[in-house]
Regions:
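S-adenosylmethionine-dependent methyltransferases
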Residues: 1-139
Length: 139
């Protein structure tokens, strides 16, 4: 839980980790401490009803969040308001059903995609997982 947050902290970034569930944020803070990392700033965030006073960021990243249509639509509405004018979003997706819809909606909102495909070994699976990493920027 919160692996992208831990990697960003390890690389010295200032991080705001968000989730719908407080328990997920607790676990992210715990994992940071267990790995000798500073505690990240955290906030509850409901993609479907976000606080409109959210900060603007140079980088927004997410992993494996494109799993249902309503989430994809909410994220496509939310991400543009979170990004600074020259900011970028990085989304990692293991080929979820609604990934093409997210790409379409973001492109309709004036964003362009650069996508890299990578293969990841996952403990407990007898096959590798292909992950698409999308770098998303305004046109």
């Amino acid at each position: 839980m919160g692996l992208p947050t831990l990697v960003a902290l390890d690389r010295g970034a200032s991080v705001l980790a968000t989730d719908y569930y407080e328990a997920a944020l607790d676990f992210t803070r715990h994992n940071a401490g267990q790995n000798g990392l500073p505690e990240p700033e955290t906030a509850l965030l409901n993609w479907r009803a976000p606080d409109r006073d959210l900060k603007v960021f140079d980088l927004v990243f997410a992993a494996d969040v494109l799993y249902e249509e309503s989430s994809v639509r909410a994220l496509a509405d939310l991400v543009p308001s979170l990004l600074a004018p020259d900011g970028e979003a990085l989304f990692a997706d293991p080929g979820r059903r609604y990934e093409p819809l997210f790409r379409e909606l973001m492109q309709e909102n004036g964003f362009r995609f650069e996508t890299e495909e990578t293969t990841v070994e996952v403990d407990g699976l007898d096959r590798d997982v292909t992950v698409l990493v999308h770098r998303i920027r305004r046109r």
